[in-house]
Amino acid sequence: MHCPFCSETDTKVIDSRLVADGAQVRRRRECLTCHDRFTTFETAELVMPRVIKQDGTREPFDEEKLRAGLQRALEKRPVSVEAIESSVQNVKHYLQALGEREVKSLMIGEKVMEELRSLDQVAYVRFASVYRSFQDLSEFQQEIDRLQKPKPSPIK
């Protein structure tokens, strides 16, 4: 950490405390060169990755776009607003946990399909038909057949 008074990099932490209900760390520091003291605050940086679209363009992650896609698929389906919000948070957490600066929109779409599969199968097929650009009834049937197969349990 650079000293704000003399710009030297040699500083030491004198005191650390949690503040803002544990969301921040307040540190008292002392410059080892000029001996002035200063305070810093640290917070976790939870930045959402940029999205690489299929045409190669990049755009910031848009939570509203994610929510709108889920709501469109779940329109007139018996799924609560809380369940939709939980799915939005699950997708965001998944993307943050990847730790990547950029993710392909394909990866987000697959995660949304995973969420929809557990929420509502009709909404899942609805979303899949648009997402995967179904051209005829046989593609719908293939997706329905896939849904009816038991999902393999993860290896422990």
UniProtKB/Swiss-Prot annotation:
Cofactor(s) demanded: Zn(2+)
Q: Which InterPro entries match?
A: ATP-cone_dom, NrdR-like_N, RNR_NrdR-like
**According to the lineage, what is the superkingdom?**
Bacteria
Question: What GO terms are given for molecular function?
Answer: ATP binding; DNA binding; zinc ion binding
Coiled-coil features, chain-numbered ranges: none
Q: What residue stretches are annotated with the ATP-cone domain?
A: 49-139
Protein family (similarity comment): Belongs to the NrdR family.
What this chain does, per the entry, is described as: Negatively regulates transcription of bacterial ribonucleotide reductase nrd genes and operons by binding to NrdR-boxes.
Which protein is depicted?
Transcriptional repressor NrdR
Gene name of the record: nrdR
